[in-house]
């Protein structure tokens, strides 16, 4: 215990100090890791401490009373601890943190006080040791450290008289606090899941052991001290959870309990975890050893100057975390992963930390003055200091570590949460890993940010300890998913941090030592809360800072709403279990301002955050950083999704601003934060873009569907979530990091979003999104329609722009009066201070969008005209052949298509959901797909003409076919969220203009809702129905396709029916006809691949049903739809814009094939290694061939099938097929 506490508490602090001071870099970090691990898992720390710290610290064991006897003159660990406290007092001058900590400890409970004092004693030992180290640099040997401690023992003993008993009690309590059991179990689980808390500890200890083998012995001792420290944490937890105070009687029994329990679950896991952590740290340890030597001196000096306070605090609470930071930045990176792990570990530890949390909260206030050296950390009370010490040697890393210990402190509340949900441990592993990796690759900066993911909450939490109780609601959210634990906890802290004003200031400064520590943590917390994605921001101090602002508003706006935010954030980041990432609650609030950032955190997240997811851990770390991001968020979303969804109606407008889901409640609070953090938001947005870009992966998958559904719930809220989801879901989703940030921006710049240009614009888009977010929030129908229209078709951008101007203007105008006022009102509400800026940004962005749309429209019109001319020629030449061939081919394909339609209709719901997932998986393809399908749509229009000539059925197919493309575009760009948004405005317009649209609307609305499986809101439901229609191919597609449909109408809907080629002319009609077309596009929206068919099926029901038999539609739909799908997959995947361009070729080919039904197939792009035998076998797999001509010089082959149907089938099957590492382009040649 003493050792554990020495590491975690008094001895732990001493260990930390030793680690940080005695063995400046390696040992101190080594011991701090032990201490942090004590923090993370007291039981594990006991085990680890015994293993690592026993050798390392006899002093730690003194903390356990055994080591204290040896190291300290006193027999009691309490003595050492108390001497530590004496040191603390003596050091209080230097480090008010200790005093503050004592105060906080005392404030919380006697047990808490004892524990805190005990830990303080340990920490003070550590602090004292730093002083002693300064005094007794020669004594840096562990014993020297302890002797140094002894030297100040008089002071410590002076205080010791008062608190030794408390320390003893505390040691007993700590030892007895069986919270350690659950904590240890939890820690074990978390450690195992995360990296194995003790393994992480051992790894850290090992890393530091590498730095100091004798420290390993100390570490083992410290492990005991850790037991003490862990027990102290447990005691604190008991303080918070009085259940374990009963065990105060048996220190040894408590220790045995911890040991046995650790052995039962934690010890084994600890060994496993230790291996894992050792592995991770080993990666970092190479530098760790080298840095250990370098850092030993640097850290000695720094710690002597600042490190003592931070060391002790960090030593005790953030000790191991601090050690990690101190030990090595890389180690910190790995440690950070561990810290995240530890966080789960901390969760177990956090019960005590919870106790500490209150103390920390009081100390933070007292602390700030004492720790002027690390003033920024002051806010994050002791942890801040700890990490500042570490940060000083490894400022970036140490800050992350710093947050980690604070989280450890804050974790206490979260420990309760972890208890509630052991799932967090898995989250932690993901996060730590992500963070681990990101720190490794990105370096210290990333490490700090990533560390904050878990640690950040801690730091805010010390101050926010009590506020954390608002956090408890987050605990449920936290509890919902393991990942949420790491993210949610941070969000919790962020919430509290938000409440705590300090984090916001820190948002900016934090990235560096002082401010960096705390603000950065909040920002990291927020970002990392969002999802693993936050780790990406770490490199960018602004990122974390921006997240902080992003989340700061969150914190300000909602301690309680924070939960909602978290809940809703989960809806997006967690709902689609990213991200986080992420896109986590904290980011949500901020997402308001920097939706892109948050969503990206998310979700840029964490899903860049996920968010993933899921990576998550995207982050998302993504988020997997979203992800954090993805796994992290997904768990939360389930529990909170219900809450967020109800809130989403309110948040619909806000959702555009990123994750308003949380913001409905938060918005009132949020509005003020937005004012304060509008500037941060821009930074956050941009940073979050990066942040989420890397992080969104975590939330990626998780977010996509939930977001779609949330989008369905509220076209706008979900778009924000969609942004988050997009981040994880697609490479776009990573861009979606930005896109998540600005789903609206995506919508506004959707054409851009599919391209990568959106990412670059996103920083602007984010601000504009934030500003436009306000506009689009309320004017979601209008702004989003515009953005949707604009963004929905990258290739269709021109048509979409036209239609978007036509339809969007038509719809936006109808909606505009209502929606735009809302835009202004909500932006004002959401961005009271940013209103003017936001409006300016929005206007600028909108103008840019309009310009882009116009340019895209012009390009699209040219393309369409060219395609139309070509197609007209082809149609004229091949009208007869095409009719005959089409009839022949369509009949067989009808059979194929009809089953496909049935399948599509059956799978429309599934595919809608998949569309979210497929969109992410096919996200890039989808995005390109839209481009390709834009061409397809043009081609479809041409085809529609041909088909109209040939058959009415072609029209529906063409329309459906185009809609799949259009919807695919939507899915690709915004996936469904944009679709939903578009659908929403379209639906409104559709309902008004088209009864038919409305008719499918209601049935599909129900169906969509069922598909969504979420009745989110009546309006969201309607929107959802529209969106879902888009997804399920119902009336919703119409709205969804509004922009695309307009394009489609140009190509298929109107064009097919009346304007075969008057796409431009059709635009005006598109507005009226768009509903019809939209329904058809809806079908195409339904799924990227299956959807196109499915949409046909649906449209047959709602729109095309009366008009044309499904069979006919299937026939035509099969050609265009299949081709579109194939091309979309093949070339469409090639690139968003490239796809579009490629698609014209495909479309031309298609037109050719559809019209003449040629038997000759041209295979281009063959690899030089491809033989005629291989080709012939490919050809023969489809049907009998008449001839095969190889043109190696042209890398081309021309084959003639006996049946045109076989040629078409071959083209559809093998176009963009990879043979010998070469993608072949299969074109039908008309003879």
From Swiss-Prot:
The keyword Acyltransferase does not apply. Residues 1-13 have a biased composition (Gly residues). The modification N-acetylalanine is found at residue 2. Residues 1-168, 219-261, 297-436, 452-761, 796-840, 876-932, 998-1080 are annotated as: Disordered. Residues 840-891 form a coiled coil. Gene3D superfamilies: 3.30.70.330. InterPro entries: Nucleotide-bd_a/b_plait_sf, RBD_domain_sf, RBM33, RRM_dom. Residues 37-49, 112-124, 153-168, 241-252 have a biased composition (Acidic residues). Residues 380-398, 880-901 have a biased composition (Low complexity). GO terms for cellular component: cytoplasm; nucleus. There is a cross-link at residue 1019 (Glycyl lysine isopeptide (Lys-Gly) (interchain with G-Cter in SUMO2)). The modification Phosphoserine is found at residues 41, 243, 271, 792, 816, 1002, 1010, 1032, 1051. Keywords: Acetylation, Coiled coil, Cytoplasm, Isopeptide bond, Methylation, mRNA transport, Nucleus, Phosphoprotein, RNA-binding, Transport, Ubl conjugation. Residues 82-108, 713-728, 736-759 have a biased composition (Polar residues). Transmembrane segments: none annotated. The modification Asymmetric dimethylarginine is found at residue 520. GO terms for biological process: mRNA transport; regulation of mRNA stability; RNA export from nucleus. Residues 20-36, 224-240, 327-344, 820-829 have a biased composition (Basic and acidic residues). This is RNA-binding protein 33. It comes from the Eukaryota. It is found in: Nucleus; Cytoplasm. Residues 360-379, 469-483, 531-540, 604-618, 632-647, 661-682 have a biased composition (Pro residues). Associates with the NXF1-NXT1 RNA export complex. Interacts with ALKBH5; facilitating ALKBH5 recruitment to m6A-containing transcripts. Interacts with SENP1; promoting ALKBH5 deSUMOylation and subsequent activation.
């Amino acid at each position: 215990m003493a050792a554990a506490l020495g590491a975690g508490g008094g001895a732990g602090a001493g260990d930390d100090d030793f680690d940080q001071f005695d063995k400046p870099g390696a040992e101190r970090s080594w011991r701090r890791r032990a201490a942090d691990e004590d923090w993370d898992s007291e039981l594990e720390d006991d085990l680890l401490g015994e293993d690592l710290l026993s050798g390392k610290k006899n002093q730690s064991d003194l903390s356990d009373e055994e080591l204290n006897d040896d190291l300290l003159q006193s027999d009691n660990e309490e003595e050492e601890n108390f001497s530590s406290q004496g040191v603390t007092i003596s050091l209080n001058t230097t480090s008010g943190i200790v005093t503050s900590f004592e105060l906080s400890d005392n404030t919380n409970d006697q047990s808490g006080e004892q524990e805190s004092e005990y830990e303080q004693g340990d920490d003070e030992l550590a602090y004292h040791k730093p002083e002693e180290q300064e005094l007794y640099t020669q004594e840096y040997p562990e014993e020297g450290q302890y002797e140094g401690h002894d030297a100040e023992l008089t002071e410590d003993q002076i205080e010791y008289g008062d608190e030794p008993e408390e320390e003893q009690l505390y040691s007993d309590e700590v030892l007895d606090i069986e919270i350690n059991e659950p904590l240890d179990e939890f820690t074990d689980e978390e450690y195992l899941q995360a990296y194995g808390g003790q393994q992480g500890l051992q790894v850290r200890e090992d890393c530091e052991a590498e730095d100091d083998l004798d420290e390993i012995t100390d570490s083992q001792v410290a492990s005991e001290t850790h037991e003490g420290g862990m027990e102290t944490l447990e005691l604190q937890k008991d303080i918070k959870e009085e259940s374990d105070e009963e065990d105060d009687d048996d220190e040894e029994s408590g220790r045995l309990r911890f040991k046995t329990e650790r052995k039962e679950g934690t010890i084994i896991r600890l060994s496993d975890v230790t291996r894992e952590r050792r592995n991770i740290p080993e990666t970092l340890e190479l530098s760790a050893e080298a840095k250990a030597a370098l850092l030993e001196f640097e850290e000695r000096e720094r710690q002597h100057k600042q490190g003592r306070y931070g060391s002790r605090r960090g030593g005790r609470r953030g000790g191991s975390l601090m050690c990690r930071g101190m030990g090595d930045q890389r180690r910190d990176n790995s440690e950070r992963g561990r810290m995240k792990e530890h966080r789960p570990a901390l969760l177990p530890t956090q019960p005590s930390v919870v106790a500490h949390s209150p103390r920390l909260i009081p100390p933070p206030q007292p602390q700030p003055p004492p720790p002027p050296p690390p003033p920024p950390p002051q806010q994050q009370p002791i942890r801040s200091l700890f990490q500042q010490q570490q940060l000083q040697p490894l400022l970036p890393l140490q800050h992350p570590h710093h947050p980690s210990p604070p989280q450890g402190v804050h974790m206490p509340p979260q420990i309760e949460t972890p208890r509630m949900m052991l799932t967090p441990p898995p989250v932690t592993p993901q996060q730590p890993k992500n963070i681990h990796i990101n720190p490794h690759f990105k370096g210290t900066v990333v490490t700090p940010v990533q560390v904050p993911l878990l640690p950040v909450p801690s730091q805010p939490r010390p101050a926010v300890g009590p506020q954390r109780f608002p956090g408890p609601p987050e605990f449920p959210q936290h509890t919902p998913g393991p990942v949420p634990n790491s993210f949610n906890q941070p969000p919790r802290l962020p919430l509290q941090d938000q409440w705590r004003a300090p984090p916001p200031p820190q948002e900016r400064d934090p990235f560096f030592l002082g401010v960096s520590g705390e603000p950065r943590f909040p920002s990291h917390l927020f970002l990392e809360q969002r999802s693993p994605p936050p780790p990406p921001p770490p490199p960018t101090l602004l990122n974390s800072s921006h997240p902080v602002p992003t989340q700061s508003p969150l914190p300000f706006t909602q301690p309680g709403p924070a939960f909602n935010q978290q809940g809703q954030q989960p809806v997006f980041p967690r709902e689609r279990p990213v991200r986080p990432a992420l896109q986590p609650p904290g980011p949500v609030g901020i997402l308001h301002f920097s939706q892109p950032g948050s969503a990206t955190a998310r979700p840029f997240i964490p899903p860049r955050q996920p968010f993933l997811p899921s990576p998550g851990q995207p982050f998302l770390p993504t988020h997997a950083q979203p992800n954090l991001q993805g796994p992290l968020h997904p768990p939360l979303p389930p529990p909170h999704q219900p809450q967020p969804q109800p809130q989403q109606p309110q948040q619909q407008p806000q959702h555009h601003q990123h994750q308003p889901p949380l913001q409905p409640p938060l918005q009132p609070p949020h509005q003020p934060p937005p004012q304060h953090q509008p500037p941060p938001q821009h930074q956050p947005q941009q940073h979050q873009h990066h942040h989420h870009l890397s992080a969104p992966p975590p939330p990626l998958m998780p977010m996509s569907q939930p977001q779609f559904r949330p989008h369905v719930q509220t076209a706008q809220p979900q778009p924000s979530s969609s942004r988050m989801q997009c981040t994880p879901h697609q490479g776009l989703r990573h861009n979606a990091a930005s896109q998540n940030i600005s789903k609206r921006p995506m919508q506004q710049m959707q054409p851009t979003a599919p391209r990568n240009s959106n990412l670059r614009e996103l920083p602007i888009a984010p601000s504009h999104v934030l500003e436009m977010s306000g506009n689009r929030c309320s004017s979601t129908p209008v702004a989003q329609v515009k953005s949707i229209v604009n963004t929905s078709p990258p290739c269709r951008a021109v048509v979409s722009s036209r239609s978007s101007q036509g339809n969007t203007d038509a719809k936006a105008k109808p909606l505009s009066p209502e929606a735009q006022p809302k835009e202004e009102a909500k932006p004002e509400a959401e961005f009271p201070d940013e209103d003017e800026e936001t409006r300016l940004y929005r206007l600028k962005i909108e103008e840019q969008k309009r310009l882009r749309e116009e340019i895209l429209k012009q390009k699209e019109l040219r393309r369409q005209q060219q395609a139309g001319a070509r197609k007209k020629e082809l149609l004229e030449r091949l009208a007869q052949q095409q009719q005959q061939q089409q009839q022949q081919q369509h009949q067989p394909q009808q059979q194929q298509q009809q089953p496909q339609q049935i399948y599509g209709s059956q799978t429309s719901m599934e595919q809608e959901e998949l569309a979210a997932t497929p969109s992410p998986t096919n996200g890039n393809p989808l995005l390109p797909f839209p481009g390709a399908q834009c061409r397809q749509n043009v081609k479809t229009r041409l085809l529609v003409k041909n088909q109209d000539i040939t058959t009415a059925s072609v029209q529906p197919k063409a329309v459906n076919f185009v809609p799949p493309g259009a919807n695919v575009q939507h899915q690709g760009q915004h996936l469904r969220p944009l679709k939903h948004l578009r659908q929403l405005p379209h639906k409104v317009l559709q309902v008004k203009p088209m009864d038919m649209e409305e008719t499918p609307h209601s049935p599909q609305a129900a169906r969509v809702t069922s598909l969504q499986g979420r009745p989110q809101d009546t309006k969201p439901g309607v929107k959802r129905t529209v969106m879902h229609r888009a997804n399920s191919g119902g009336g919703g597609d119409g709205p969804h396709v509004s922009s695309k449909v307009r394009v489609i109408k140009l190509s298929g809907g109107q064009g097919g029916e009346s304007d075969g080629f008057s796409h431009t002319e059709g635009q005006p009609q598109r507005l009226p006809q768009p509903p019809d077309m939209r329904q058809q596009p809806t079908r195409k929206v339904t799924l990227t691949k299956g959807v196109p068919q499915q949409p046909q099926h649906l449209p047959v029901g709602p729109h095309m049903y009366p008009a044309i038999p499904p069979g006919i539609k299937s026939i035509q739909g099969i050609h265009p739809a299949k081709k579109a799908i194939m091309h979309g997959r093949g070339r469409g995947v090639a690139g968003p814009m490239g796809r579009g361009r490629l698609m014209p070729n495909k479309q031309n080919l298609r037109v050719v094939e559809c019209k003449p039904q040629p038997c000759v197939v041209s295979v281009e792009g063959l690899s030089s290694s491809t033989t005629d035998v291989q080709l012939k076998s490919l050809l023969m797999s489809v049907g009998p061939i008449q001839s095969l001509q190889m043109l190696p010089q042209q890398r081309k082959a021309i084959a003639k099938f006996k049946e045109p149907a076989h040629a078409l089938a071959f083209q559809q099957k093998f176009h963009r097929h990879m043979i010998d590492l070469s993608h072949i382009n299969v074109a039908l040649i008309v003879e």
